[in-house]
């Protein structure tokens, strides 16, 4: 891991190597989020910024994602980082009409999209060459199925 990230601190995110800080309890840390890998920083910041979108950001009256929805999206990002696929790219983070958050990982001709809905449910779809191959509920626990999804994604590099 690059030394420049070893003790990087921003307003919202503090990075520490996983060897020194394996457990993260975000709610106890208030506005500091400890991350496992440097690629998490940008998508977590993007997810947090979605809370400040104005109502109607999509011109259809949609609310911004609620705090709980953003926290769930951050949980997905964090759980993906803990799987150990260091060669995958960071996800793009988008608001979804109705108050959801979409995370999109791209790797070659493969794409994994995870959508966090305002009701707390989390859905995924895997896409190859623009064609959806599989969709379903995204599992945060146990990580076995998520690891299969990210293994599929990483093999597209």
Where are these regions (language model features)?
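Eukaryotic low-complexity, non-globular regulatory regions
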Residues: 1-92, 126-157
